[in-house]
């Protein structure tokens, strides 16, 4: 068994055959654009700021996405070597920018693990904590350190990637490497709105186990809805169609959009456990 999840065996014959018909992730990606009500999200964030609690757009999107995945667990499946696996955890990878003292901007990739006992506040706190620990020039996470070491030895990167790819293909890649890799994730998300850029449909990587890539774009007038006085945030989503059926994807997106329409549903632990204490929410002014 792979360290990141067991193989799914109780599949209909056609579903089990699809990964052999489309063996590569780039063969199997579909894309969709969802428009999120920017006015409603901003109003929700402002409401909690008045209560002294800090939230941001990416935390809102991730929380709604994860809550919908708990209702539709097949969205956390992945395909490797022609087989479908059920991931035994949920994590999100994303990129942040780090500005050096000479003005050059570098990127680093972070990964956050979520639990069913999380709510929108604990998810926001986890994201802020991992960003705070990695946003400065002198800070390096384990992924950065490993990459820096790998590229310090001529010829090593090509061999390491080749070895990791083949070990992963046969379920032999160690859990420690999977934890280091941003490409082994339930969802990869990028927030292009933060740099005032339009959304794109970003491919899912062939290396690793990413089945869904979400890209947040800068808000635009609601042309589709016909109300140009309101803004929506377009989200480009690319998904691996092999992990579930179109009907199951549709059910997921219905739930996802439902949580975004009523964000108050994300304020209590997703598994119904005891709500967190008020002091565990991220207060305004704390990054």
Predicted segment positions?
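C-terminal catalytic/motor cores of large multi-domain enzyme assemblies
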Residues: 1-287
């Amino acid at each position: 068994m792979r360290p990141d999840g067991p193989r799914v065996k109780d599949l209909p014959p056609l579903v089990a055959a699809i990964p052999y018909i489309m063996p590569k992730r780039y063969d199997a990606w579909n894309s969709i654009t969802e428009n999120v009500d920017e006015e409603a999200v901003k109003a929700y964030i402002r409401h909690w700021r008045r209560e002294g609690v800090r939230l941001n757009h990416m935390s809102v999107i991730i929380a709604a996405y994860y809550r919908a995945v708990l209702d539709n667990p097949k969205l956390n499946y992945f395909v490797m070597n022609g087989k479908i696996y059920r991931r035994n955890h949920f994590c999100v990878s994303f990129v942040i920018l780090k500005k050096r003292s000479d003005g050059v901007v570098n990127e680093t990739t972070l990964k956050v693990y979520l639990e069913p006992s999380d709510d929108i506040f604990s998810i926001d706190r986890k994201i802020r904590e991992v960003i705070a620990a990695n946003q400065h020039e002198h800070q390096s996470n384990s992924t950065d350190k490993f990459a820096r070491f790998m590229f310090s030895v001529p010829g090593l990167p090509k061999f390491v990637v080749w070895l990791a790819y083949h070990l992963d293909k046969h379920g032999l890649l160690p859990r420690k490497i999977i934890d280091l890799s941003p490409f082994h994730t339930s969802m990869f998300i990028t927030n292009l709105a933060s740099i005032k850029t339009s959304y794109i449909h970003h491919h899912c990587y062939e290396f690793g186990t990413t089945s869904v890539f979400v890209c947040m774009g800068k808000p635009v007038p609601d042309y589709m809805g016909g109300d140009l006085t309101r803004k929506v945030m377009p989200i480009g989503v690319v998904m691996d169609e092999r992990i579930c059926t179109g009907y199951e994807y549709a059910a997921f997106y219905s739930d996802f959009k439902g949580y975004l329409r009523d964000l108050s549903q994300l304020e209590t632990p997703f598994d119904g456990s005891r709500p967190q204490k008020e002091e565990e929410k991220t207060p305004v002014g704390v990054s």
